């Protein structure tokens, strides 16, 4: 009954808005952070459109603006505050405008306090587990005229709504949320809570529904997918789930994100080599190459065990490609430690790397470490890391020259409407000159050019 009341209240708001302004209220969602946040934003989009909101063409010019925030990096946090500040005058000119802030930042008390004290233009604050309460929160704010906050944690994952995704052929399916690892630099377990897994039945139902809608490339999403199933009443391994999803008729490609190196089992590695829809690509963050740094990070694997798993993956999955996350300048990192990181980069031969200077996150254990590395040293190491990584990316892409690759055409190039972009099974970005009729299709493409970050192809029969 409560759900129906929420819908009635929110529809009343939309109807009132239409009567006042003679058009439906518009919305804009500004998303910071990881693929989990992107997926959450799609859920918010679905709720708003079901209420009667229409998407705005302008990010910072809409009747309802939602900021989906990230807490992992300080610069993402600062961007949100800057964008909120820019809306102060706009809100004064348009008092009917609604502003909401959600996501990982809002799971921490200090960030919520800053919003309360410095950004009175914000109307609604909600957490990562409270997205489905948005209709009710809108109504509460309109009734009270005051800031409404809902960050209460839930013990289950609510994934019942049919999500309206931004891409019609490539999509993400959330299989779990939270993390139990508590790496010393990471705020995620505090923001998203402990691991919770969706049921196999719920996941398979969503995958089948997406395939029926035309989706061809699906990524199973979680903070640490290799821990999937441990919290279920009848525990299931991630390998068992992957096998069941692989069997869904009509699905073309299957991926997963993200994996923790300590949890990748021999069973999973073997399955990746046998399951025909599982793509030859894995994102495997190693963060640092030094065992002493890894221990201080509480990663619970060593440089040697990481490289051993990489070799097993290379043997099991023909042509597999690797991407990773790397942090330089972690507290206590010496030049010798940094050289260990460069050694891993050279030995693995990554196709892509997300590289970061360590930045302190209040509330994490590493923030309390006394031996912080100077900023200029961090910057120097980041630049030297990229000097090693970029030539590897270049040589990896060069190896595709003249080969025929299966490419799923995903949409128009941002730079040239006559060029479409797509991905190979190994997650290589390919620019292909063809018309829009090929969007959503798998096409054989000959690679004729490249740079460090993308390939250029021509369609072949």
From Swiss-Prot:
Pfam families: Radical_SAM, TRAM, UPF0004
Complex and partners: Monomer.
Keyword Cytoplasm: yes
Function: Catalyzes the methylthiolation of N6-(dimethylallyl)adenosine (i(6)A), leading to the formation of 2-methylthio-N6-(dimethylallyl)adenosine (ms(2)i(6)A) at position 37 in tRNAs that read codons beginning with uridine.
EC number of this enzyme: 2.8.4.3
Alphabetical list of PROSITE patterns matching this protein: MTTASE_N, MTTASE_RADICAL, RADICAL_SAM, TRAM
SMART domains, per database record: Elp3
Protein's UniProt name: tRNA-2-methylthio-N(6)-dimethylallyladenosine synthase
One annotated GO molecular function: metal ion binding
MTTase N-terminal domain residues: 25-143
Substrates-to-products reaction catalysed: N(6)-dimethylallyladenosine(37) in tRNA + (sulfur carrier)-SH + AH2 + 2 S-adenosyl-L-methionine = 2-methylsulfanyl-N(6)-dimethylallyladenosine(37) in tRNA + (sulfur carrier)-H + 5'-deoxyadenosine + L-methionine + A + S-adenosyl-L-homocysteine + 2 H(+)
Cellular compartments annotated: Cytoplasm
Gene: miaB
Sorted UniProt keywords: 4Fe-4S, Cytoplasm, Iron, Iron-sulfur, Metal-binding, S-adenosyl-L-methionine, Transferase, tRNA processing
Species: Finegoldia magna (strain ATCC 29328 / DSM 20472 / WAL 2508) (Peptostreptococcus magnus)
Domain of life: Bacteria
GO cellular component, as recorded: cytosol
Binding-site residues, [4Fe-4S] cluster 2: 179, 183, 186
EC primary class: transferase
Cofactor(s), by name: [4Fe-4S] cluster
Entry's cofactor comment: Binds 2 [4Fe-4S] clusters. One cluster is coordinated with 3 cysteines and an exchangeable S-adenosyl-L-methionine.
Sequence positions that bind [4Fe-4S] cluster 1: 34, 70, 104
Radical SAM core domain mapped to chain residues: 165-395
NCBIfam families on file: miaB-methiolase (TIGR01574), MiaB/RimO family radical SAM methylthiotransferase (TIGR00089)
Family membership noted in the UniProt record: Belongs to the methylthiotransferase family. MiaB subfamily.
Record-annotated TRAM domain positions: 398-461
